[in-house]
Amino acid sequence: QLTTNFYSTSCPNLLSTVKSGVKSAVSSQPRMGASILRLFFHDCFVNGCDGSILLDDTSSFTGEQNAGPNRNSARGFTVINDIKSAVEKACPGVVSCADILAIAARDSVVQLGGPNWNVKVGRRDAKTASQAAANSNIPAPSMSLSQLISSFSAVGLSTRDMVALSGAHTIGQSRCVNFRARVYNETNINAAFATLRQRSCPRAAGSGDANLAPLDINSATSFDNSYFKNLMAQRGLLHSDQVLFNGGSTDSIVRGYSNSPSSFNSDFAAAMIKMGDISPLTGSSGEIRKVCGKTN
């Protein structure tokens, strides 16, 4: 039901408006590209790509922003809200927040040197959000390979899609609380890498939990295939990263992406399109929010 030209007459300047908003945000803070990409991922895995993650909590409404996977780590809301304001000025009441997020995720990847793809649009915005669904549906950094495969399979994404999409960890940062167990307790880790990461992540739980480390030690603000090379050298930061190359069924996919940037880029773009197709609201379902943080 989604098409690439859904707004071509109703909002002809949409793509350029989103692109310029992303460009200024990511040039002033390169990490923001990863943050926006992650927002889209966390949106799509909870009742589909419906903009539900963008709804702010109120006294009478509990949404997804304070679910475990998002609290203190989801960011980029202001960037999306600012882009939405600019789009509203140009085409009031036409473009959904869900679509703006989908386009911004693509623009973030491109801005950091990654592949381009045509974003399908026509999604509408959810009128509700579910903290419980966010807690249960978003893949966790502690997951095993089989759990990751199941989690992606539940939303129609293949094992290959899962490995390609994990390659998004070529950009962005992770908090110590999410890699502490790996750098202190696991053995399938490069020793020098473990020591380096321990420096900014104290062993004691609760100590330095929010300290950040780059998911890709080589090029944290370049969208490239070095994430996969790191996995082959046992320098995956999260448990859920290293399980992709640990003697299991996905080793060959990691090896392939490590050898061929072009095959990673094309598979990543295809998987992003598939992820963007998860359970959209279309037709008369949902609404077009006036502001992304609250329902109309």
UniProtKB/Swiss-Prot annotation:
Binding site for Ca(2+) 1: 43, 46, 48, 50, 52
Source organism of this protein record: Brassica rapa subsp. rapa
UniProt miscellaneous comment: The protein shown, TP7, is the principal isoperoxidase during winter in turnip.
Residues carrying a glycan: 185
Pyrrolidone carboxylic acid modifications at: 1
Annotated heme b binding sites: 169
Family annotation (CDD domains): secretory_peroxidase
Annotated site residues (Transition state stabilizer) in this chain: 38
Name assigned to this protein: Peroxidase P7
Disulfide bond listed as a keyword: yes
